[in-house]
Amino acid sequence: MAGELILVVEDNEKNRKLVRDVLTVKGYRLLESETGEEGLRLASEHHPALVLMDIQLPGIDGIETLRRLRADAATATIPVVAVTASAMMHDRQKILAAGFDGYQAKPISVRPFLELVREVLDRPPRSGS
């Protein structure tokens, strides 16, 4: 169901704009953050249905941000998808092994990206840590 709140944690404005344009036209509501620290605060305050997160962020990176989200009972069950330029197979495996709920390589292809977002949102809630 469209209308869900999605947090986008991405330091590149062009990438945020692309994701914003793709998701808002489908009816999703967005929060945006340029850093992992701000993303943690927004996730805790707003409890989005999904977090889309870059891996290479200023300050704490996406993997550390995910670790902190999972360690906090208030945000531990929020699904998090990595959206990253790290497209090599070993990078993908490392990212998924870190506990991300999905992986999207950049540049994004709109249809597969929207399918991934919908698929992750439709999954049963994850168990808390």
PLM feature spans:
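Acidic catalytic/metal-coordinating carboxylates
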Residues: 14, 35-38, 61-67
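Charged docking surfaces used in two-component/phosphorelay signaling
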Residues: 17-25
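C-terminal output helix
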Residues: 108-117
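Conserved acidic carboxylate
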Residues: 10
